[in-house]
Design a protein with these regions (language model features):
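Small-residue-rich beta-alpha loop regions that form the catalytic core of phosphotransfer
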Residues: 4, 8-9, 14-174
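Short helix/loop capping segments that flank catalytic or ligand/cofactor-binding pockets
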Residues: 29, 220-221, 293, 318
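Short, well-ordered alpha-helix to beta-strand connector turns
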Residues: 63, 86, 206-207, 233, ...
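Conserved Motif II region of HX4D acyltransferases
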Residues: 74, 210, 296
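Short, isolated positions in well-ordered beta-strands
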Residues: 119, 136, 201-204, 299, ...
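Short polybasic amphipathic segments
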Residues: 126-133, 192-198, 282, 289-292, ...
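ATP/pyrophosphate-binding catalytic subdomain of soluble kinases
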Residues: 142-241
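ATP/nucleoside-binding phosphotransfer catalytic cores, i.e., glycine-rich phosphate-binding loops
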Residues: 229-231, 241-323
Length: 323
């Protein structure tokens, strides 16, 4: 009798629910379709479709998996909802630069297709960055409940507005070239008054760039040669503002940016205008409101004190580039 029951139920699995989200404003969204995603993920799921910006993204509690089709900013917004949930997140990168997907090529998370390449297709938790406002009451410092997550970069200053100011239609038509016209426009020193406190040292200065990073690349440059995808750490890259203003300041800012992004960074550095440190967490104090670029989307940090840290997700994550 036991044998018969075993045979009856052998190989049967309950259908799981999967929400497919396609951002129609993503740079190369025309490459993807609901049919392609369903074909890739297979027959184990019962699918529901959602498009951005037409539909409101619902709570994921009714789903076992979420397929995200968009760019890095789309992924970050979905991870904020899914990070602490026991579900699978399949990322189909159809953005413009797709830096997060390219970063995963340097880890063990990349997959061709979870249904046809089982070994590579096993989704795993990932390490994400977290920015939380610190509040001091009665001598105690606590984190605000409303936290912001980023999948690979959280940065402010020179060049960072390119990620969120480029025109959607231009990105869809010209791809990464849409950013080129913005480079000259955004080549200018910034003077962000801030204090960056790591576990070893505190930097109180004016900065042209402040970047918290969990990636080997950003801006399309593969420069962070110290990247370790499995580690619970990330990096902070800070470039001090030029000492001079005007034309001399523009010339002065060229050298540390060239050193960081074109020559790359393999070891920690604290020399001249350039700071590059491995961190598990760091405190950031801003003297004024600052516009940050969070995975390609604009995110305003109000004047105050914040904690940047890194944590492992509860959800499992997988990049699918071939579909």
């Amino acid at each position: 009798m036991h044998k018969i029951i075993k045979n009856v139920y052998k190989g049967t699995k309950p259908m799981q629910n999967c929400l497919i989200i396609i951002n129609k404003n993503a740079g190369s969204s025309k490459k993807i379709s609901f049919e392609k995603v369903e074909k890739c993920l297979g027959d184990d799921y019962r699918y529901k479709h959602c498009t951005i910006p037409d539909d409101e993204i619902e709570n994921f509690s009714a789903y076992d998996a979420v397929a995200v089709c968009g760019g890095d900013g789309t992924l970050a917004s979905i991870l904020e909802k899914a990070c602490d949930m026991p579900l699978k997140v399949f990322y189909f990168p159809v953005g413009t630069l797709n830096d997060k997907a390219k970063a995963e090529r340097y880890s063990h998370l990349k997959a061709k297709c979870p249904s046809c390449d089982e070994e590579k297709g096993k989704a795993k938790p990932i390490v994400v960055g977290k920015c939380a406002r610190l509040i001091e009451e009665d001598g105690y410092i606590t984190e605000e409940c409303d936290k912001s997550l980023f999948s690979y970069v959280f940065a402010a200053g020179s060049f960072t507005p390119i990620g969120y100011t480029s025109d959607v239609k231009e990105k869809q038509k010209f791809g990464a070239l849409a950013y080129v016209s913005k480079v000259v426009e955004e080549y200018k020193p910034h003077r962000i008054k801030a204090t960056i406190a790591t576990d070893k040292k505190t930097y109180d200065d004016e900065f042209s760039l402040i970047m918290f990073l969990k990636s080997p690349r950003c801006f399309g440059f593969h420069f962070n040669k110290a990247y370790n995808g499995e580690s619970m750490s990330g990096h902070v890259l800070a470039i001090r503002s030029p000492k001079h203003k005007g034309a001399l300041g523009y010339i002065e800012m060229f050298f540390p940016f060239f050193r960081a992004f074109f020559m790359g960074l393999k070891k920690e550095r604290d020399k001249g205008s350039l700071i590059f440190k491995k961190i598990y967490s760091a405190n950031l104090t801003l003297s004024e409101d600052v516009d940050f670029c969070k995975d390609g989307e604009k995110h305003v940090l109000k004047k105050g004190r914040y904690k940047i840290s890194f944590r492992r997700s509860l959800c499992d994550f997988c990049v699918i580039e071939k579909f």
